[in-house]
Amino acid sequence: MVKRIEIVQKDKISLERLKKFRDVSESYQPENYKNKVVLKPWGYEYLIFENEHVAIWFLYIKYGHSTSMHCHPEKKTSLILLSGSALCNTFERRNYLNSMDAIILEKAVFHSTKALSTQGINVIEIETPPNKTDLVRLNDEYGRETSGYEGLTQMRTENLEEFNHFFFETPEQNECYTHTNSNYEVSIK
């Protein structure tokens, strides 16, 4: 099942109110996110593919943990649940997701994703256009409401295999790259 979520008035009002408190310290961001794992209080994420039009990220969210209630004012985001069960909240509704369900969030839609499965959840996040610092947090159980995207100090560049890290280069025409795990398989063509 794929659900599409449109922006509502409450998203617009909340974003306008929060924009003035936004901390986007881009000086603490790497030149690129390739071969880095970003550590989060809820788990971790890493880039698996990027070109000038799209960035695709792999997220692992621990059981009972949740991302902040946040939005991306300038980019559309799609989430595909690879394994487990999740709850993706917006201002309008609670969206329960199971393995291979997806949600498409228009620009500036506030949302949070919580892992309901005891083994945590694996998620693919597709962002268009690529811009990791396009982030405004409304609520965060870890105290990051006024913070921008995690900086270099929250990024790992060594022992990436501990996180089952993978990255896809741009495939040649008719080529397909695949990453397989015991819980999922991801391909890019």
List each language-model region with its residue ranges:
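Short amphipathic
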Residues: 58-60
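Histidine-centered active-site/metal-ligand motif
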Residues: 70-72, 111
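Short acidic-glycine-tyrosine-enriched beta hairpin
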Residues: 78, 91-111
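A short hydrophobic beta-strand segment most commonly corresponding to one strand
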Residues: 78, 118-140
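Asparagine-centered strand-capping/turn motif at beta-strand->loop junctions
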Residues: 112-117
